[in-house]
Swiss-Prot record:
List of glycosylated residues: N392, N461
Molecular-function GO term, any one: beta-galactosidase activity
InterPro entries membership: BetaGal_gal-bd (IPR048913), Galactose-bd-like_sf (IPR008979), GHD (IPR041392), Gly_Hdrlase_35_cat (IPR031330), Glyco_hydro_35_CS (IPR019801), Glycoside_Hdrlase_35 (IPR001944), Glycoside_hydrolase_SF (IPR017853), Lectin_gal-bd_dom (IPR000922)
Name of the protein described by the UniProt record: Beta-galactosidase 5
Domain SUEL-type lectin as annotated: residue spans: 752-838
Catalytic activity annotation: Hydrolysis of terminal non-reducing beta-D-galactose residues in beta-D-galactosides
Gene Ontology biological process terms from the UniProt entry: galactose catabolic process; plant-type cell wall modification
Family designation: Belongs to the glycosyl hydrolase 35 family.
The protein's Enzyme Commission number: 3.2.1.23
Active site per database record: E183, E252
Alphabetical list of SUPFAM superfamilies matching this protein: (Trans)glycosidases, Galactose-binding domain-like
Keyword Secreted recorded: yes
Length: 841
């Protein structure tokens, strides 16, 4: 960061008694990098989306990102959150964009603002407001005047806000980059010439807003000048910009993957993520953004998909709750430090590539400022011994070593020296709740319908996304002489729906349910139809589970019951109900009465006592009160005993829950070889999401109102509030582990050997209470499964206990003298340790 920009950013960070001059920062680019005040920069960035956390979390998240070695915070701008109805804007609470950007500025960091306004992001309707679908004549993301007018209006609104607050770097603010559109390349091919015209218009419109900072388009090879095209993906080392005078930028380095209800948790090993980043840098990449760095939570009904979970954890370096995910956070922090040591050669010279073996090579950057080298082993199966500058180096499989002086290794992507945190959800029993219940009214449906229509209506056209729920209600007359009433073959009902979930009621009784999937959100329901003689009420509850967030022609997408709806087995054969008269009710009665709110929950009589647990029927509202647990650990609700529905705390929506069990392949994972989303799966046979984040800032000290709407039926007595804490820490470090401090000292002409060390650290308020495993020698296994190898020092446990028990953090040198002697001379040794963290009394 240039001195002028740094002064401007920090000028807003502290209250001082003198005026701080606004320093205008010039942000430009050339083929090597983004230039800030004329200085080429290697920039590490991380995605943190402001609506996916609370304003009270922003300071801590951004400070941790800065501590992790980031320079930039990247965020989308969420159109449907900011303009829920045409011309009515919301920039409050979690949507206070200006406050978020100023929080980044206060931390002395930059911002990459992705205005879009299409964002994808597994966010409801891709960030578009649903009302946009009903603008006459609209066609999304193509050369269409109604769409372009709306898009330009919102883009101008956001840019105008940023300018009025002096938030662009050209005004002394932190925003150094902006983005228009998002991942248009695949969609643009669908539109042909109209798509090309649209993307040219979008670029010209954005540049014409005169922000004074560069604009970016990601996954758009045809981005017109001066807009920079950038890469998204698990790897981007083969990417090149579309013009030789543009920098090589990676706007989304996927740190993990999103999760869908019914799917497994997708994890990306940090060794592979670090390898991908180092490989990008050695090929000339100079801007890297982790998507996500903190994923956060899809509060309310903001999750897209459909079927995207409420948790947007993304296996990111900072987990859903804002805690460091180790070793991912720490290992990437060391990577950033190592790359920054090479910054001047990297931005000053093109690499010289030298072959070191059949699958090994060196990328060397030489300039007047020094020499830096990246030694790569692309073999995913075996170590490689290579000679570089007449020195011998050992490279683990699928790894890159970084040498800031072309001599000393300070970092290897596959050699993890930081600790691993073992996390737990701890319920202390103090949060047990007394539950009350209120049954959603089904019998009175259609008494006062919103509307009636001949035939079936598309769900969004009726609800306008004001609720997930829409009732389709009709009647069926049955003659008393029907054979099925005299013991004949039972009737059946089939329903075709565009998704996403369907509950079928006949005469107030649940007949069955059906669900789509992300791959095929359409539903084909087939089940018994328990009709009786006379008039029967058929009520279909269609449930949206997040609107799709990716694809083309948003204006044509359908949700809800589309038909046909057919009764089978009558004496007449089949009776098609599709074109009967249908009545519609938007939302639930409980929603209309605001049962989720402090005021509304007092407007009805709630069932109390033992009847609540005994009567686990569908479409039920549950209510309980609880006091806020002590401490400052993040909180979560255990919903594993429930089925499917929504949760509110003090009137604010936690999000959708669904105890759908994960199906997949969880046979294990190794970091080597190209990563793809199905590669490393976890959670098979368990609920995809069991725990739901409860922000502490939403709570009051006592009598917090918890309301749950349950669609299917569940046991509310087992819902519990828990704290997310560190239960233990592990480390596994070689006595020859690369050390950045070694190189820094040696580079100043005083070579000095520094022993590798094991660092253990519990969470604040905790101490190390026990050593479950310790071995100095050749231990086997990984965290949680360590065991002694052929070589083991008998003093291992006692040394670790003496150094660590009773402390929050400890450091243990890896040397024979520290362990009372060398248990196996001439053998490379390691220390593996697993320690227990306990809350201090």
């Amino acid at each position: 960061m240039g001195r002028g920009c740094l002064a401007a950013l920090l000028g807003g960070a502290v209250a001082v008694a003198v005026l701080v001059a606004v320093v205008h920062c010039a942000v430009t680019y050339d083929k090597k990098a983004v230039l800030v005040d004329g200085q080429r920069r290697i920039l590490f960035s991380g995605s943190i989306h402001y609506p996916r956390s609370t304003p009270e979390m922003w300071d801590g998240l951004i400070e941790k990102a800065k501590d992790g070695g980031l320079d930039v915070i990247q965020t989308y701008v969420f159109w449907n959150g900011h303009e829920p109805t045409p011309g009515n804007y919301n920039f409050e609470g979690r949507y206070d964009l200006v406050r978020f950007i100023k929080t980044v500025q206060k931390a002395g960091m930059f911002v990459h603002l992705r205005i879009g306004p299409y964002i994808c992001g597994e966010w409801n309707f891709g960030g578009f407001p649903v009302w946009l679908k009903y603008v006459p004549g609209i066609s999304f993301r193509t050369d269409n005047e109604p769409f372009k007018n709306a898009m330009q209006g919102f883009t101008e609104k956001i840019v105008g806000m940023m300018k009025s607050e002096n938030l662009f770097a050209s005004q002394g603010g932190p925003i150094i980059l902006s983005q228009i559109e998002n991942e248009y390349g695949p969609e643009g091919k669908e539109f042909g010439a109209a798509g090309k015209a649209y993307i040219n218009w979008a670029a010209k419109m954005a540049v014409g807003l005169d922000t004074g900072v560069p604009w970016v388009m990601c996954k758009e090879d045809d981005a017109p000048d001066p807009v920079i095209n950038a890469c998204n993906g698990f790897y981007c080392d083969t990417f090149s910009p579309n013009k030789p005078y543009k920098p090589t930028m990676w706007t989304e380095a996927w740190s993990g993957w999103f999760t869908e209800f019914g799917g497994t948790i997708r994890q990306r090993p940090v060794e592979d993520l670090a390898f991908g980043v180092a490989r990008f840098v050695q090929k000339g990449g100079s801007f890297i953004n982790y998507y996500m760095y903190h994923g956060g939570t899809n509060f309310g009904r903001t999750a897209g998909g459909p079927f995207i979970t409420t948790s947007y954890d993304y296996d990111a370096p900072l987990d859903e709750y804002g805690l460091a995910r180790e070793p991912k956070f720490g290992h990437l922090k060391e990577l950033h430090r190592a790359v920054k040591l090479c910054e001047q050669p990297l931005v000053s010279a093109d690499p010289t590539v030298t072959t070191l073996g059949s699958m090994q090579e060196a990328h060397v950057f030489r300039s007047s400022s020094g020499c830096a080298a990246f030694l790569a082993n692309y073999n995913s199966n075996s170590y490689a011994k290579v000679i570089f500058n007449n020195e011998n180096y050992s490279l683990p499989p699928w790894s890159i070593s970084i040498l800031p002086d072309c001599k000393n290794v300070v970092f290897n992507t596959a050699t993890v020296g930081v600790q691993t945190n073992q996390m737990q959800m701890w319920a202390d029993g103090a949060s047990s709740m007394m539950w009350e219940k209120y049954d959603e009214e089904v019998d009175s449906l259609a008494a006062a319908p919103l509307l009636t229509s001949t035939g079936l209506l598309e769900q969004l056209n009726v609800t306008r996304d004001t609720s997930d729920y829409l009732w389709y209600i009709t009647s069926v007359e049955v003659d008393p002489s029907e054979k099925f009433l005299q013991g004949g073959t039972p009737l059946s009902l089939t329903v075709q729906s565009a998704g996403h979930a369907l509950h079928v009621f006949i005469n107030g009784q649940l007949q069955g349910s059906a669900y789509g999937t992300r791959e095929d959100r359409k539903i084909s329901y087939s089940g018994n139809a328990n009709l009786r003689a006379g008039t029967n009420k058929v009520a279909l509850l269609s449930v949206a589970c997040g609107l799709p967030n990716v694809g083309v022609h948003y204006e044509t997408w359908n949700t809800g019951v589309v038909g046909p709806v057919v009764i089978h087995g009558l004496d007449e054969g089949s009776r098609d109900l599709t074109w009967q008269t249908w009545s519609y009710q938007v939302g639930l009665k409980g929603e209309q009465m605001n049962l989720n709110s402090l005021e509304g929950s007092g407007s009805v009589e709630w069932m109390q006592g033992s009847l609540v647990a005994q009567n686990q029927q569908p479409l039920a509202w549950y209510r309980a009160y609880f006091d806020t647990p002590s401490g400052d650990e993040p909180l979560a609700l255990d919903m594993g005993s429930m089925g499917k529905g929504q949760i509110w705390i003090n009137g604010q929506s936690i999000g959708r829950y669904w105890t759908a069990y994960a199906e997949g392949d969880c046979k294990g994972c190794h970091y080597t070889g190209s990563y793809r989303a199905p590669k490393c799966q976890a959670g098979c046979g368990q609920p995809t999401q069991r725990w739901y984040h409860v922000p502490r800032s939403w709570l009051q000290p006592t009598r917090n109102l918890l309301v749950v709407f349950e669609e299917l039926g569940g046991d509310s007595s087992k819902i519990a509030l828990a704290k997310r804490t560190v239960s233990g820490v592990c480390a596994d470090v070689s006595e020859y582990h690369p050390n950045i401090k070694n190189w820094q000292i040696e580079s100043y002409g005083e070579p000095e050997f520094h022993t590798a060390k094991v660092h253990l650290k519990c969470a604040p308020g905790q101490t190390i209470s026990a050593i479950k495993f310790a071995s100095f020698g050749t231990p086997l296994g990984t965290c949680g499964t360590f065991q002694q190898g052929e070589c083991h020092s008998i003093n291992s446990n006692s040394v670790l206990e003496k150094k660590c028990i009773g402390l929050q953090r400890c450091v243990v040198a890896i040397s024979p003298s520290n362990f009372g002697g060398d248990p196996c001379p001439e053998v490379m040794k390691r220390v593996a340790v697993e320690a227990v963290c306990s809350t201090a009394a």
